[in-house]
C-alpha cells in the first residue's frame, strides 16, 4: 500500500479504501471492474499492477456494482489476474501555490523542470468551483498583446474567451509565444489621450497548457519563455504527443484550476493559453469510442459541446475579486475546415475568434491574421475614451470597411484588368497592399503599443480623402486626420 500512497501527490492525504481484484476487461484507455461496493462517479482510484507499479484512474461510469475507470497513464500491462484497484473516495485534486509561477509541469501537474517540489497552499478539485452567474462581472479593460491586428481590430477584454483558429503548418505556436512575451495589463486612463503604458507589473500571470504537442514544440516554448525572461510569470503544463492520450482530458482542467487560484485567491489577472484543443477533442473521441457510445458528427461524442463549455466557461471575472481569467484557446482546423466540429462548437461557446490565414502565410506575412473572419464580441467594452483612445472604435470600423472593399476591388481587377478601375478603386488597392505589408505584418519580436498601432492605422487611412472615410465622425476626423503621427 506504500507504493500507492506515494502515488497520491495530486490528491493530498486520502483515506485509502478497499482493494479489489475484480478487473473483468480492458478497452483502450478504460478498465472495467465488477463486484465493487459503492463506487462513485469521478472517484479517483489507485491501480497496482502485478509488477508493483502504480497508476491512477477516474471512475467514468457506474452501474450497480460495475464501474468503468479511465486510466491516466494508459492500460498497457493491466490484466485481470494480478491487478488490484483501490477506491479512494476522493475526486481528482491538484496542489496549487503561488510558487507554481516560473515552473514547468507535465500534463498531470507533476514538476518536470528538476526544481524543488511544490509546497501546496491548497488542494483544489480540477473541475473547478461553481460560480454563481449573477456574481459574474462583465469583462472590461483591455489586455494589450502588442500585435496590431488584435489590439486595434479584435481587442481582448480582461475576462474574455477568444480562440485562435489555425491549421497545420501555420505559425500559431509562434503567435502564442509572442502573446506570452508581450501581453500585459493596460492601465485605465484618466483623462490623458496620448499616454498609455504597457505595464509589466506583478499583477499579471500566464498559465500555458500544451496538449498533444511534439518534443520540438515543447522545447520551443520552454526555450522561448526562458530566453526572453517571461518565464517568471508563466506556469507551463506540457502533455507531449507520446504521453497518454487520456491525460489530455485533465491537462486543461489542471491548468484552469491553477489559474483560478492565482486569479481569485492571489488577485492576479491571468491569461490562459490552451493549445491544441483539437488534440483534446480527439482524446475525448477516443474515450467515447472505447465506451462504445453512439457517435455524433465525425465520430465525436454528442456531449462534446457541453464538455468544451466546462473548459471555456471558466474564464471571466467575479464580483468582489480582484483577479480575472482570460482564455485564448488555440485549435488547428483539420484540412483548414472551419465547419469541423471542434472549431464549430468552439465558436458557439466563445466570444469571437482570431483567424490565422494560410494565404497570408504563403505570402510571407507574419502574423498571418485575416481580420475579415476575425471577431471580438466584447471589444466594445474594452476600448474607447478612458480605456484606450476615443477614436479606437471608429478607426477599427473604417479599417474593416476599407479592407473589405479593397479585397472586392482586387477580385474585380482579376476579371476586368487594372485599366478598367477608377481612381477611387486604385486608392483601395493601394490601401490593401500597405495594410497587409505595414499593419498586419510585424516582426515576431516587434511590440507595438495601442497608440503606435492606432497612429499607424491613421497613416494608412490618410491614403483616402476625408470624404471617403464614411465611418469616422467629422469631430474625430478634425482631431486626428491631419495630426502629426509623431504625437
Swiss-Prot record:
Protein origin, superkingdom: Eukaryota
GO biological process, alphabetically ordered: ATP metabolic process
InterPro entries per UniProt: ATP-synt_VA_C, ATPase_a/bsu_AS, ATPase_F1/V1/A1_a/bsu_N, ATPase_F1/V1/A1_a/bsu_nucl-bd, ATPase_V1-cplx_bsu, P-loop_NTPase, V-ATPase_su_B/beta
Gene Ontology MF, one: ATP binding
Annotated positions of the N-acetylglycine modification: 2
One family name in Pfam for this protein: ATP-synt_VA_C
Family, similarity comment: Belongs to the ATPase alpha/beta chains family.
Protein location: Vacuole membrane
UniProt topology in membrane: Peripheral membrane protein
Quaternary structure (record): V-ATPase is a heteromultimeric enzyme composed of a peripheral catalytic V1 complex (components A to H) attached to an integral membrane V0 proton pore complex (components: a, c, c'', d and e).
GO annotations of cellular component type: proton-transporting V-type ATPase, V1 domain; vacuolar membrane
Keywords in alphabetical order: Acetylation, Hydrogen ion transport, Ion transport, Membrane, Transport, Vacuole
The name this protein goes by in its record: V-type proton ATPase subunit B2
Function: Non-catalytic subunit of the peripheral V1 complex of vacuolar ATPase. V-ATPase is responsible for acidifying a variety of intracellular compartments in eukaryotic cells.
Main location: membrane
Amino acid at each position: 500500500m506504500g507504493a500507492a500512497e506515494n502515488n497520491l501527490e495530486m490528491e493530498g492525504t486520502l483515506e485509502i479504501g478497499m482493494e479489489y481484484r475484480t478487473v473483468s476487461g480492458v478497452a483502450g484507455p478504460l478498465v472495467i471492474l465488477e463486484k465493487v461496493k459503492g463506487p462513485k462517479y469521478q472517484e479517483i482510484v489507485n491501480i497496482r499492477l502485478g509488477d508493483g507499479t502504480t497508476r491512477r484512474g477516474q471512475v467514468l461510469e457506474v452501474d450497480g456494482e460495475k464501474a468503468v475507470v479511465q486510466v491516466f497513464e494508459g492500460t498497457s500491462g493491466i490484466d485481470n489476474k494480478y491487478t488490484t484497484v483501490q477506491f479512494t473516495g476522493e475526486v481528482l485534486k491538484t496542489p496549487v501555490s503561488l510558487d507554481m509561477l516560473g515552473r514547468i509541469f507535465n500534463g498531470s501537474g507533476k514538476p518536470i523542470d528538476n526544481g524543488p517540489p511544490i509546497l501546496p497552499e491548497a488542494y483544489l478539485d480540477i473541475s473547478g468551483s461553481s460560480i454563481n452567474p449573477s456574481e459574474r462581472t462583465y469583462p472590461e479593460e483591455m489586455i494589450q498583446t502588442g500585435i496590431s491586428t488584435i489590439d486595434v481590430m479584435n481587442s481582448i477584454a480582461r475576462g474574455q474567451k477568444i480562440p485562435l483558429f489555425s491549421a497545420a503548418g501555420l505559425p500559431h505556436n509562434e503567435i502564442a509565444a509572442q502573446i506570452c512575451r508581450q501581453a500585459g495589463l493596460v492601465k485605465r486612463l484618466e483623462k490623458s489621450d496620448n499616454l498609455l503604458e504597457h505595464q509589466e507589473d506583478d499583477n499579471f500571470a500566464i498559465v500555458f497548457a500544451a496538449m498533444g504537442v511534439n518534443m520540438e514544440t515543447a522545447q520551443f516554448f520552454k526555450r522561448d519563455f526562458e530566453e526572453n525572461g517571461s518565464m517568471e510569470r508563466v506556469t507551463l503544463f506540457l502533455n507531449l504527443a507520446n504521453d497518454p492520450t487520456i491525460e489530455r482530458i485533465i491537462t486543461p482542467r489542471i491548468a484552469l484550476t491553477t489559474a483560478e487560484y492565482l486569479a481569485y485567491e492571489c488577485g492576479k489577472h491571468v491569461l490562459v493559453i490552451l493549445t491544441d484543443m483539437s488534440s483534446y477533442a480527439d482524446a475525448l473521441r477516443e474515450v467515447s469510442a472505447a465506451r462504445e457510445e453512439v457517435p455524433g458528427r465525425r465520430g465525436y461524442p454528442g456531449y462534446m459541446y457541453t464538455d468544451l463549455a466546462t473548459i471555456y466557461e471558466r474564464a471571466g471575472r467575479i464580483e468582489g475579486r480582484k483577479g480575472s481569467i482570460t482564455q485564448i484557446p488555440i485549435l488547428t482546423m483539420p484540412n483548414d475546415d472551419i465547419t469541423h466540429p471542434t472549431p464549430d462548437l468552439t465558436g458557439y461557446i466563445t466570444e469571437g475568434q482570431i483567424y490565422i490565414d494560410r494565404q497570408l502565410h504563403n505570402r510571407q506575412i507574419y502574423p498571418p491574421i485575416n481580420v475579415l473572419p476575425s471577431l471580438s464580441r466584447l471589444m466594445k467594452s474594452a476600448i474607447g475614451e478612458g480605456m484606450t483612445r476615443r477614436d479606437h472604435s471608429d478607426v477599427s470600423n473604417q479599417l474593416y470597411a476599407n479592407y473589405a472593399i479593397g479585397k472586392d476591388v482586387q477580385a474585380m481587377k482579376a476579371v476586368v484588368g487594372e485599366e478598367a478601375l477608377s481612381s477611387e478603386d486604385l486608392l483601395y488597392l493601394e490601401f490593401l497592399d500597405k495594410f497587409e505589408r505595414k499593419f498586419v505584418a510585424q516582426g515576431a519580436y516587434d511590440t507595438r503599443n495601442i497608440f503606435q498601432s492606432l497612429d499607424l492605422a491613421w497613416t494608412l487611412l490618410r491614403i483616402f480623402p476625408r470624404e471617403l472615410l464614411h465611418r469616422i465622425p467629422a469631430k474625430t476626423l478634425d482631431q486626428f486626420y491631419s495630426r502629426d503621427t509623431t504625437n
